[in-house]
């Protein structure tokens, strides 16, 4: 697949600086993408430092495989498998920093053939790894109104979820929806457009993409695994791009940085007992993009960088 990807990493300096990189440290880039963050980390590592990168997208893996550096290793896997990977590499409790740059990557959104864009026509796929799972086209064809409406409402916060779901199923009864613009136009004709700068299909496309790739479940598993992988003083830095992601990250950090409050006389769970005595995380910072960065890179507009550290 010959395609040139023009990717500007969001808050790159802030993300890299947040790690406080040690020259001989061990780091994990959980979302390699086109390698912008990984390459910056490698520049700061000494000869005995190590960087492990992960990406489920086969094209991202192909890009990463071209990096010939003995300090670098990349695997083609979901980041929810971080713990298994760390066990295999024998780096549990030894990692100095882990980064996540969540959401869809430029590899996916900029290539119409991947089926993520509601602006350019392509096959309605949306799988981050096209070799696994069901495509968006197949899922919409096989699902009923209730199932589609649930996904649009819960993963896209779409007010008109049921109306859109009915329109999709009406078209599906005539023929399967197979292209991105076909779906985008169905949605555009179904709901009112108040903001000319925001496409009416954006929430629905986000919702379907999140569901098809099980993104929120993947994030939850990956975040929990970082608590075992990082060493004391190790940092986790996460960039999210929409409220569902950021809510999940914020909840994870708050839950693991505050002690449990147990009402007197109530039974206590093992998790609550652990939280009574220890707080695993210390929240370091929350950073938003500057207006200058937003002007130069509109994709930065909704981004949030959250940083936390494993307690010493």
From Swiss-Prot:
Reactions it catalyzes: cytidine(1402) in 16S rRNA + S-adenosyl-L-methionine = N(4)-methylcytidine(1402) in 16S rRNA + S-adenosyl-L-homocysteine + H(+)
Cellular component terms (Gene Ontology): cytoplasm
Subcellular location: Cytoplasm
Keywords: Cytoplasm, Methyltransferase, rRNA processing, S-adenosyl-L-methionine, Transferase
Residues noted as binding S-adenosyl-L-methionine in the record, renumbered to the chain: 35-37, 55, 85, 101, 108
One function term, GO molecular function aspect: rRNA (cytosine-N4-)-methyltransferase activity
E.C. code: 2.1.1.199
Major subcellular site: cytoplasm
GO biological process: rRNA base methylation
Origin superkingdom: Bacteria
Stated family: Belongs to the methyltransferase superfamily. RsmH family.
General function of this protein: Specifically methylates the N4 position of cytidine in position 1402 (C1402) of 16S rRNA.
Protein name: Ribosomal RNA small subunit methyltransferase H
Organism: Buchnera aphidicola subsp. Acyrthosiphon pisum (strain Tuc7)
